[in-house]
């Protein structure tokens, strides 16, 4: 068909949504996946395949010591590469120098497994198959990336206590394993113990052993941790109790059906690692799955042509990190003959064809050709010309500011942010603010790291230079380097934490501590997989504080890199949107069941604070006030009794009246209305005041309008005369909380309908800002401050799968966020820890918890806790790399491929273009299809062959 047909002939308005029709048409075949998975998961391994103690024998490794270096040298000289698994590999295991652990591969059994391949175009419905599997089967759902895992959590509507995890966290990977996996020395050493060369991997047994060797430093560390814990449990209790404790270590003990999303980002050997740990944990815990001899069934979901799996190596001596393209799991299952035959891929491949994220037919046809590597037609190339815009426009931050910019490299993203910040400083300086990022370095651990990395070095490298060179590794999320960071790093010495605590009052309240609206547990904070950490640290040694500053833009589009703890404290949006949320119970419905009471309490607090707006809106007249006073106010026993007691009390103490309607006091100059942005730019403050919570005092002798209003019952809101501020949830039963919520909601909706009728519908379009039981002040530096010095709300989490708007920051105490003081140096706590405030798509405001992370470095077989960083865990959605955008759906996209892009690949083009949900909102600086690019030709023949194979399950 013609690629321009849609532009020449207008299409009739469909009766049903296109996405709905496409999903319904594929539903029947998606259900067949369940039957296929059931069949694969019934496989059993033979009882003689494993002895009960197999995990003990394979974990025993030989280590050399400094006392006998000749033995290591002799063993290394005799180590040879064999074409089969033999006892000589075990002898070679004792040859390891430098403390790197190597396995005794002659004792390894073969770990059988089954695999199902699920691939398809971007937005074609692969996630739908995961939803169906989760609904119909008992399976372990995971993702390769944090974004993929959190996206699945949202789609599957998982509760806060059952969030989807990454596959790495499921099998026990923690931050200390990052340097173990990247160590160049370890990988060079382990290469000597491969049972054969890659081209000689003619059997699945050889392939499995070589793949496990590639990841052995991490495997060995996790295995040792588990075995040590098992032995301690067995020594203090019974073997059965130890096995039961081990069974709770990993979700891999829950089911033999393991679903992994975005497998195109996972290296080939990780498939065998997952299989290994499935057997390890189940054998260690003697689980039902192990006793029934269940073979693991791995469901690999993703696209082999969208992105690449990257392999990284880090050299401590040169401090260089090399990154190269590796073979991902999906490509291996499609191309590797050994895996194809063993997994019977021809019969176990499900392929989704059409794009449902963007239902434009011409655009979908183009993406289909790009996904499968089919040679493009001339009309495809010509079709992309329509998206080209001048490069100067895309690189100009003021042009189409609402569009997300995508670039090939981090350098280009940094350059764009610098241009953006410079432009904002000239026109909207009040939108810029910067916050400190702290790094507390343990001097003793850093000194030891330098000695291990360079034993012959005269003096250690300056710590601030090391910090700058390793910033992307220390701040463990890739997009951190894209932010506009200060070039200057301040360095200062810190006293030992114990001395600081002894000097100051030890009972000082921790920042962020205190009472909690949601309870004392503080939510489901993800902790390390193993609590007993053998990393070397020196808590009482001297420490160095490194500080740099990071610049943010108020109103910019942002995301988070991982599930971050947050507190919902308010709402900011239009009155109409807030009413829609109330009528549909949107916030209540999206809240997990165990938090229902807290959700009702929070929305009740927002409604209480928002009631003032009916009396102070720009459209309010005396006639409207009379009508508002007639709205029925039902009795709420928990609120009215306290109000009656207050009314019976003497006159207002200190001249404070709960009916003060002091709102936006600095909002005018000379009787003229001044825009909020202009007031903020002139250093003034915007106040959102709740009458009965106001602490405003005016010492002037002049009689103000507010004082005159106090004597006029017309301007006294009967709502605040009848009801007091809602108490905390701990003082109310669930029934009382729900009754309070429904009463406030009904009053608000009645008032809204009245105002709509009297204003001709204009009231709905007004902006509404309301905070939970608090008055707030917006300061000129983007700081949001509570007049009580604290915020209270509902503990929740923000997800990397969602996009948020940055509203500013607060330095006030957040009562609902548990304290992190025990993880942060007390001198850093004393300086005050600011928290960012985000707004989600519905308009709810979140206070984001600070991100505290420990950086553990491994060198010469020793793990060192070198430093702890305190930052904000934020990534920008205003601009990002194309690789980072993988898995996201973006409304408006502007892609900059550069002037003369090098190493441009079809995967880059495909991922960048397929992020958009509507091609009308896509622009690019060039037509990348007219430039030289690397084609995905290697995998195309396999995909084309599968499309023609009747055994392949095709879902359109």
From Swiss-Prot:
It comes from the Viruses. The keyword Nucleotide-binding applies. It is an enzyme of class 3 (hydrolase). GO terms for molecular function: ATP binding; helicase activity; hydrolase activity. GO terms for cellular component: host cell nucleus. InterPro entries: DNA_helicase_dom, HSV_HELI, P-loop_NTPase. Its EC number is 3.6.4.-. Its main location: host cell. Residues 658-694 are annotated as: Disordered. It is found in: Host nucleus. Residues 667-678 have a biased composition (Low complexity). ATP binds at residues 120-127. Residues 679-694 have a biased composition (Basic and acidic residues). Pfam families: Herpes_Helicase. One of its GO terms (biological process) is DNA replication. Keywords: ATP-binding, DNA replication, Helicase, Host nucleus, Hydrolase, Nucleotide-binding. Transmembrane segments: none annotated. Associates with the primase and the primase-associated factor to form the helicase-primase complex. Component of the helicase/primase complex. Unwinds the DNA at the replication forks and generates single-stranded DNA for both leading and lagging strand synthesis. The primase synthesizes short RNA primers on the lagging strand that the polymerase elongates using dNTPs. Possesses helicase-like motifs and therefore may act as the helicase subunit of the complex. Belongs to the herpesviridae helicase family. This is DNA replication helicase. It comes from Human cytomegalovirus (strain Merlin) (HHV-5).
């Amino acid at each position: 068909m013609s690629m321009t047909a849609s532009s020449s002939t207008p299409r009739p308005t469909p009766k049903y949504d296109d996405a709905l029709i496409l999903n319904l048409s594929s539903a029947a075949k998606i259900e067949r996946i369940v039957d296929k998975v059931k069949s694969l998961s019934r496989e059993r391994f033979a009882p003689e395949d494993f002895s009960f103690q197999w995990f003990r024998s394979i974990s025993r490794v030989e280590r050399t010591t400094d006392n006998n270096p000749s033995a290591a040298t002799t063993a290394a000289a005799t180590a040879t590469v064999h074409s089969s698994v033999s006892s000589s590999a075990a002898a070679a295991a004792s040859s390891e120098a430098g403390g790197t652990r190597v396995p005794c591969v002659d004792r390894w059994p073969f770990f059988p497994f089954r695999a199902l391949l699920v691939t398809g175009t971007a937005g074609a419905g692969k996630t739908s198959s995961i939803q169906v599997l989760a609904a119909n089967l008992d399976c372990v759902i995971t993702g390769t990336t944090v974004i993929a895992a959190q996206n699945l959590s949202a789609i599957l509507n998982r509760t806060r206590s059952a969030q989807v995890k990454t596959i790495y966290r499921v099998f026990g990977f923690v931050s200390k394993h990052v340097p173990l996996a990247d160590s160049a020395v370890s990988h060079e050493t382990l290469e000597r113990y491969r049972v054969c060369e890659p081209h000689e991997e003619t059997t699945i047994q050889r392939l499995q052993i070589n793949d496990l060797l590639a990841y052995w430093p991490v495997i060995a560390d996790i295995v040792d941790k588990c075995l040590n814990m098992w032995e301690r449990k067995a020594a203090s209790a019974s073997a059965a109790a130890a096995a039961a404790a081990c069974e709770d270590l990993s979700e891999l003990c829950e089911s033999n059906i393991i679903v992994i999303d975005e497998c195109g980002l996972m290296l080939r050997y990780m498939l065998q690692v997952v299989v290994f740990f499935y057997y390890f944990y189940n054998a260690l815990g003697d689980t039902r799955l192990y006793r029934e001899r269940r073979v693991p069934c791995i469901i690999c979901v993703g696209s082999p042509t969208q992105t690449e799996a990257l392999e990284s190596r880090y050299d401590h001596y040169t401090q260089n990190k090399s990154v190269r393209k590796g073979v991902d799991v999906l490509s291996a299952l499609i191309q590797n003959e050994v895996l194809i035959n063993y997994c019977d891929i021809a019969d176990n491949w499900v392929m989704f064809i059409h794009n449902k994220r963007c239902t434009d037919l011409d655009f979908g046809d183009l993406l289909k050709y790009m996904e499968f590597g089919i040679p493009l037609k001339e009309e495809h190339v010509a079709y992309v010309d329509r998206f080209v815009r001048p490069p100067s426009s895309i690189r100009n931050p003021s042009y189409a500011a609402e569009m997300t910019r995508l670039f090939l490299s981090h350098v280009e993203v940094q350059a764009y942010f610098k241009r953006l910040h410079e432009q904002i400083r000239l026109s909207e300086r009040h939108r810029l603010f910067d916050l400190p990022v702290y790094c507390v370095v343990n001097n003793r651990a850093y000194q030891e790291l330098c000695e291990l990395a360079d034993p012959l070095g005269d003096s250690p490298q300056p710590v601030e230079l090391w910090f700058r060179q390793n910033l992307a590794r220390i701040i463990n999320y890739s997009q951190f380097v894209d932010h506009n960071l200060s070039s200057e790093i301040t360095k200062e010495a810190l006293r030992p934490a114990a001395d600081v605590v002894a000097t100051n009052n030890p009972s000082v309240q921790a920042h962020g501590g205190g009472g909690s609206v949601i309870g004392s547990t503080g939510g489901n904070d993800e902790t390390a997989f193993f609590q007993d950490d053998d990393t070397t640290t020196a808590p009482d040694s001297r420490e160095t504080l490194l500080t740099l500053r990071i610049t943010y833009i108020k109103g910019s589009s942002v995301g988070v890199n991982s599930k971050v703890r947050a507190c919902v404290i308010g709402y900011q949006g239009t009155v109409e949107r807030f009413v829609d949320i109330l009528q549909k119970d949107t916030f209540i419905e999206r809240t997990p069941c165990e938090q229902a009471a807290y959700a009702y309490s929070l929305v009740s607090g927002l409604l209480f604070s928002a009631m003032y707006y009916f009396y102070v809106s720009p459209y309010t007249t005396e006639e409207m006030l009379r009508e508002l006073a007639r709205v029925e106010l039902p009795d709420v026993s928990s609120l009215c009794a306290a109000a009656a007691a207050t009314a019976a009390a003497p006159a207002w103490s200190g001249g404070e009246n709960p009916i003060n309607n002091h709102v936006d006091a600095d909002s005018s100059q000379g009787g003229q209305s001044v825009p909020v942005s202009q007031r903020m730019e002139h250093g003034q403050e915007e106040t959102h005041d709740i009458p009965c919570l106001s602490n405003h005092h005016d010492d002037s002798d002049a009689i103000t309008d507010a004082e005159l209003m106090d004597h006029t019952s017309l301007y006294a809101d009967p709502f605040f005369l009848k009801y007091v501020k809602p108490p905390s949830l701990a003082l109310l039963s669930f029934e009382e909380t729900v009754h309070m919520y429904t009463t406030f909601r009904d009053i608000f909706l009645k008032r809204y309908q009245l105002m709509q009728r009297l204003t001709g519908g204009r009231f709905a379009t007004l902006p509404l800002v309301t905070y939970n039981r608090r008055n707030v002040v917006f300061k000129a530096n983007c700081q949001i401050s509570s007049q009580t010095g604290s915020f209270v709300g509902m503990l929740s989490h923000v997800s990397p799968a969602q996009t948020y708007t940055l509203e500013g920051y607060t330095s006030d105490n957040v009562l609902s966020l548990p304290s992190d003081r025990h993880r942060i140096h007390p001198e850093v706590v004393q300086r005050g820890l600011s928290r960012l405030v985000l707004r989600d798509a519905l308009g709810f405001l979140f206070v984001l918890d600070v991100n505290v992370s420990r950086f553990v470095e491994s060198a010469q077989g020793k793990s060192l806790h070198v430093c702890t960083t305190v930052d904000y865990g934020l990534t920008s959605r205003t601009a990002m790399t194309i690789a980072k955008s993988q898995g996201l759906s973006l409304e408006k996209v502007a892609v900059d491929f550069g002037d003369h892009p090098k190493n441009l690949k079809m995967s880059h083009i495909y991922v960048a273009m397929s992020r958009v949900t509507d091609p009308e909102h896509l622009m690019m600086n060039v037509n990348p299809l007219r430039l030289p690019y690397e084609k995905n030709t290697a995998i195309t023949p396999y995909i084309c062959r599968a499309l023609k194979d009747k055994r392949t399950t095709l879902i359109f």
